[in-house]
Amino acid sequence: MNAGSDPVVIVSAARTIIGSFNGALAAVPVQDLGSTVIKEVLKRATVAPEDVSEVIFGHVLAAGCGQNPVRQASVGAGIPYSVPAWSCQMICGSGLKAVCLAVQSIGIGDSSIVVAGGMENMSKAPHLAYLRTGVKIGEMPLTDSILCDGLTDAFHNCHMGITAENVAKKWQVSREDQDKVAVLSQNRTENAQKAGHFDKEIVPVLVSTRKGLIEVKTDEFPRHGSNIEAMSKLKPYFLTDGTGTVTPANASGINDGAAAVVLMKKSEADKRGLTPLARIVSWSQVGVEPSIMGIGPIPAIKQAVTKAGWSLEDVDIFEINEAFAAVSAAIVKELGLNPEKVNIEGGAIALGHPLGASGCRILVTLLHTLERMGRSRGVAALCIGGGMGIAMCVQRE
């Protein structure tokens, strides 16, 4: 795609906090997380719910959530029954793919205003048992839907952590290099939290507790005070034969959260007196060998930047999802990026990685960082389980 004379723009962007596994958001149904951000982005954009053409959200772990959880989130946010709502599933890239689909829908004239984003409550993902034909005798094993549907490669039957180990070996990313990336992510996020840099992008979530409703408004996954000495003591988790380098500390987390943006054409924003956060310049998606899925952002970023008519040097800020430190280091190394331009507020290693929400979460953070720093050009990108990558170029005027 190309921006054209009347580009698609983002007029508001927000996210919930990112909750730890079985943490602050664990009891909040995923559709309620979605409703929370949908309400907020519409409020910020001063768009009436009935003016929305369509709602598109990424969502991965849908088992047991009821019929069309995104439709539930849409209606729960006050959007009328007459407005369609649906989900897309591209594992880690789902939340950004939803934004791409919104851009396409608006671009061809099918929609005028779209709410796009992603949501996930990994804490509520169920264990599954196949009992349709009954169990004649013996035990019935349970399948963890997080592992089965989210974190296990279907082609090589291996955990995503093994694909990170494969990238580390092929791109010669040492354990020390990975731990340095992880500590930097934690330290940057700690600094950003203390400086209030995330405050504007976060919408508080009301959580029911024994003491009544409480307002949750601070990301709870980051570990303040992280240092290389403590991190280097952790043992590799996925390969335990002495060759492993990926640990729980240099990998992203299992998390809960939601994020959303409101999109429309520039002419529609002008008519409504809205100042866009950015315009969508280009986007790209690619496929790669699944066993090294983490390198997906490399060709995706190259393609998106080329479509935009930019060079990598033209980009002010990159938000590249930190699924694993090994992957982040390999991407920066292969593309020759300036580390000072990449994930400057920290990334998923510190903040967390709620699968279906992460694609839009990094876009929301990118938009607010560009605004706060007065920068113009940004790229959001993610690697995707199953061997894919997705990237988007945005520009502030």
Curated annotation (Swiss-Prot):
This protein's name: Acetyl-CoA acetyltransferase, cytosolic
Record-annotated site: Increases nucleophilicity of active site Cys: 353
Chief localisation class: cytoplasm
Gene3D superfamilies: 3.40.47.10
Highest taxon above the source species: Eukaryota
Subunit note: Homotetramer.
Subcellular localization: Cytoplasm, Cytosol
Function: Involved in the biosynthetic pathway of cholesterol.
Active site location: 92 (acyl-thioester intermediate), 383 (proton donor/acceptor)
Residues with PTM N6-acetyllysine: 200, 233, 235
Record Pfam families: Thiolase_C, Thiolase_N
GO BP, sorted A to Z: fatty acid metabolic process; lipid metabolic process
Enzyme Commission designation: 2.3.1.9
GO CC annotation: cytoplasm; cytosol; extracellular exosome
Species, as recorded: Homo sapiens
Keywords, sorted A to Z: Acetylation, Acyltransferase, Cytoplasm, Transferase
CDD domains named among the record's database cross-references: thiolase
Reactions catalysed: 2 acetyl-CoA = acetoacetyl-CoA + CoA
